Amino acid sequence: MNLLRGRTFFVLILLILFFGFKSPAFLSVSSIITIVKHVALYGIIGVGMTYVIITGGIDLSVGAIVGLVGMIAGGLIVEGLPVKALGVTLYFDVPAIILITLLLGGFLGWINGTIITKFNVAPFIATLGMMNIARGLAMLRTNGATYSNIAGEQVLGNTGFNRLGSSAGGIPVVVFLFFAIAAVAMLILKFTP
């Protein structure tokens, strides 16, 4: 196994032992669960970035696009989508909000890919531009503020995001989501040319 041959694995073990001796709370169950939860979030993004790196590219805009679609998801939960022409505000349920944000993120990624492939712009430059556009749009969306309460309201049917942060059997749901995404990505890499 390559992991055991590399120095990085042993450095990781040394760091865990060092911080475990420095603070016994570091090796507590709650601390380890918190670390695993955060690693899983970055792992999900890392799975997607793996495909970009395999093709020899780079995508600097990922974090900004995640921030933008997160800001839009928060806005859809807290404020809904005002339709001024009809004088109504539309509220979406969580699956619809997830679908909207995935489609928007995919669309922005498609724009990156189109600029890179059709116009022969270097991936670094194209994604740097998209990073600044996504950051700017996120700032414009809320004037630099954040959404602090995205629990939604039962009456509007937009609750459920808090389930993504919950646990199943003591393990955060996002960890299961990471392993599912990683497994699908692995199968795609293994069985497609």
Per-region residue spans from a language model:
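N-terminal membrane topogenic signal
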Residues: M1-F9
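Single transmembrane alpha-helix segments in multi-pass membrane proteins
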Residues: G6, L17-K22, L27-L81, T114-F124
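Hydrophobic core segments of alpha-helical transmembrane domains in multi-pass membrane transport
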Residues: F9-F21, M49-T50, T101-G105, A134-G136, ...
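Membrane-embedded alpha-helical core segments of multi-pass
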Residues: I44-G48, V69, L81, L104-I111, ...
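A cytosolic-side transmembrane-helix exit/cap motif
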Residues: V52-I54, P82-F92, R141-G152
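Alpha-helical transmembrane segments within multi-pass membrane transporters and channels
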Residues: L81-M130
